[in-house]
Amino acid sequence: MNIPTKFTTSKIRSDFLEFFKNKGHKIVPSAPLVPGNDPTLLFTNSGMVQFKDVFLGAEKRSEVRVADVQCCLRAGGKHNDLDSVGYTARHHTFFEMLGNWSFGDYFKKEAITWAWELLTHVWELPPERLLVTVYHTDDESYALWRDMVGVPEDRIVRIGDNKGAPFASDNFWQMADTGPCGPCTEIFYDHGEHIPGGPPGSPDEDGDRFIEIWNLVFMQFDRQSDGTLVPLPAPCVDTGMGLERLAAILQHVHTNYEIDLFQTLILKAAELTAVADVQNKSLRVIADHSRACAFLIVDGVLPSNEGRGYVLRRIIRRALRHGWMLGVRQPFFNNMVPTLVAVMGDAYPKLQAAAESVMRTLLAEEERFAETLDVGMKIFNEVAAKVANGVIPGSDAFRLYDTYGFPVDLTADIARERGMSVDMVGFEAAMTQQRKTARAAGKFGRGVQLSAERAAMLSPTVFLGYEQLQADGLRVVALLSDGGLTDSASVGDEVIVLTDRTPFYAESGGQVGDIGTLMASDGVRLEVTDTQKLMGQFHGHVARIVQGGVKVGDVLSGSVAVARRKMVALNHSATHLLHCALRSVFGTHVVQKGSLVAPDRLRFDFSHFEPIAAAQMTLIERMVNDEVRANHLVMIEQMGMQAALDAGAMALFGEKYGEHVRVVTMGTSVELCGGTHINRTGDIGLFKIISECGVSSGVRRIEAVTGESALNHVLAEEHRLYEVAGLIGSNANDVVNHIRQLTDRQKTLERELEKLKGKLISGTITDLLSTAVNVADVKVVAARLDGLDGKALREALDRLKLQLSDAVIVLAGVTGGKVALVTAVNGRRAMGKVKADTLLSHVATQINGRGGGRVDFAQGGGEDGPSLRSALDGVATWVKQHLN
């Protein structure tokens, strides 16, 4: 295999960044695959995601020229390429997008000429191989390509509104129905006449001859609700170019899977699966999915059964299923990671740093899925064998998903390979029904949001609560109820109040929202029961009006519940110390996965692969309390994001940060945090862990208390200790030794009791044999045995069977008013005519009991009383009837 070296993927990356750095661009790192504070987006799926707020006007950046290589994922939600991966030349779950951006600085002239310079001069692409498209009314771009760059007119294609509506075009970009939009120009590479396909805009444009390599978007309009376009005061540029697609062209291969990066991964997959044919599509799937899975785990996503974690689990399981198809029955997928690090670790140091954690996560998932895959394939085969029309019923696909953990796209994948399909309508119907059943009503206020139009009219809430817990002059800018916006509200109404400023902290970063009161000078009073953040920038006071009324424009005073805020601050600072201690004890793979910072407790979820031993728990608790006793000053600074990271600050999973961040330092703990904290660590007083458990694969949870709550917990534990000491006749200091003596004594007595029971059973057997009734040459024994439990009854039953070759036996052990029943049928004379389970039901129903078993043995129970005697007395008659 000949892997080209002149333009490796690594060199293409560095060429791109170096080129735009020399053009005055700030080089920024790739944003995480998990978008911060954007619930509408499952994953970062394009280069513009991290700059979305800039284009919407919600975020200001100091840099006006930026370039980056953005990691992207399309494997869930609206943008989902998962089904196509491995079967086409250019679909991937994970891909890298090269992009350069202008925020009100340069525009079309620079973007177009620089793109041409990079492609033809740096990367040496023949100009005659390039073709460009422009929006049909974008005469400016057309003229720049023709007159300044020199592209012949027959290589410039105007694309109109080809999607059925005004401005609905491949060459007109818009973020939504309203807002920033504009024309785009795309650069295509022509593979030559020997490849089928026509130029863009032609009937044959879907062929492989002309491949889009770079899209230059010119955001120059603001689209109004009536469809009109208003010029933006500061037009922007947004460009995107797929690294893998470009590498295929520069390396003179026709599919992305033939480039150097993928060939290295495919060779490794072939080695791990012992497959000689490197063209095997399953190897492509494994190679592609190794990148997606590794980078998702690096960015804090772990396999689970919901949300992003479920998408990761689906990708892992799809790769494992393709390994299974190749005959692999042992874990292998995790061993792709070292090769991935070798080809991408230099560009992404975070991948190199997290390699061990990634491998452990993948290995755990492989071991978990091995049995599921085996069982799921058997079920699929059974279903497929019964299908006559080639369509797997949606109900069966849902059963595979819900009961056996088989993602539906995996079922569809297998079906497709067999020339079948899945009834997705039926599957979605079953899924919808399950969601309806499981859905619970949400808390008031959490589901209410502002419209984008209304939000654009408001300025973000100014938070005063770091310095003050009471503030006057808070102007009401909006009122919301479950029905949406309202202009006013009166006594008894529950509303969400938005003010221009507030001392109330809005729930975020795991810290609960503040409570308190909002008041006006005319006696108006609102009880604030929660504070939620709306659209990431507005503080919504969830309140009930207890006196007077409130309307938009009113001016209020706000008071936060001080004692509660302080208790929350204690717990928030304690989570920082706990996080630091966990990383110190277990290593840097420990990353916060979620938290709850409430006034009465804290909950901290973190990545770790095994339960925490008691000794480790003690060590962690001691380390936190050492930091508490050190009484460190809690220092809070505002600084640039990069400066904070250079200073060692930890950025938390799932959080979005701006250019300037708030850095909280206490002792050796340094974190980016927008929450509220104490002044000194000594204010925490005492830190006490109250529980530790696993919440999902690779995620552990610690719950703890601080301050007075911790003291109360310790006092309660001490009280329980004294209670236990009193119950066993010991003092508190000697409880453990005393309990050890009691347990030793208990074990001795239990052994003696077993011996006595054995003797009792031996004597009982002799008595029972003497009471046996002969019914048609079958011995029938039906007896009450006081004091014998189920285990002793079964032993007595087994001994009787050894001495009675043809017998029907019913034994009733009575203890504390409860009856344990066992029945047995032994020997050829009775077997087949008398069934032990039927006999047991006959007896049990007479004593308000029940049970079950086999034809030769059954067990159950019931209640003691006069009916037991008559039930046992009637056994011989019942047996006689069945034998005859």
From Swiss-Prot:
GO function terms (MF aspect): alanine-tRNA ligase activity; aminoacyl-tRNA deacylase activity; ATP binding; tRNA binding; zinc ion binding
Keyword Magnesium in annotation: no
Cofactor annotation remark: Binds 1 zinc ion per subunit.
Pfam families reported in the protein's UniProt record: DHHA1 (PF02272), tRNA-synt_2c (PF01411), tRNA_SAD (PF07973)
Cofactor or coenzyme needed: Zn(2+)
Signal peptide coordinates: none
GO biological process: alanyl-tRNA aminoacylation; negative regulation of DNA-templated transcription
EC number: 6.1.1.7
Keyword annotations from UniProtKB, A to Z: Aminoacyl-tRNA synthetase, ATP-binding, Cytoplasm, Ligase, Metal-binding, Nucleotide-binding, Protein biosynthesis, RNA-binding, tRNA-binding, Zinc
Domain notes from UniProt: Consists of three domains; the N-terminal catalytic domain, the editing domain and the C-terminal C-Ala domain. The editing domain removes incorrectly charged amino acids, while the C-Ala domain, along with tRNA(Ala), serves as a bridge to cooperatively bring together the editing and aminoacylation centers thus stimulating deacylation of misacylated tRNAs.
Protein name: Alanine--tRNA ligase
Organism ancestry: Bacteria, Pseudomonadati, Pseudomonadota, Gammaproteobacteria, Lysobacterales
Gene: alaS
